Amino acid sequence: MQTGDLVMFRGRGPVAAIIRWWTRSAWDHCGVLWMVEGVPCVIEARFSGGVAVHALANRQEDGPTVYPTGRLVDIPGALVHCGDLYSVKDAILAGLGESGDHAGWECAEFAALLLGLDHDARGWTPQGLIEALSAQP
């Protein structure tokens, strides 16, 4: 695992199942790995708390899967967004394949920003991130 890897989550609750159905994805949430002095953390936009950094060990109940991306991440630039709000509206629009108004962040949109993808191009979903990264050389 290294900073910049994509971390995909598959929660167990009914809301997670609805998100997977709505976004046609195997995952309901994603974030970007940040190794902090050897400790794997994830920087992510979550419904509860908005953009924040959490130790990956504290997120094991959501069945994380780590996908190597080989991408460099601007951590100081990412940390500027800590405390930004989560956007339910953007999350709903992402499920429709539309881009939101960026009044806040939804998880895949924020991960796309951190990974250097065009986060304004479309409504990002966890599945869409995997597909976009797989298609790039």
Please state what every model-predicted region is.
Residues T3-D5:
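Loop/turn positions that initiate beta-strands
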Residues F9-R71, L93-H102:
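Glycine-rich catalytic cores of cysteine/serine-nucleophile enzymes that process amide/ester linkages
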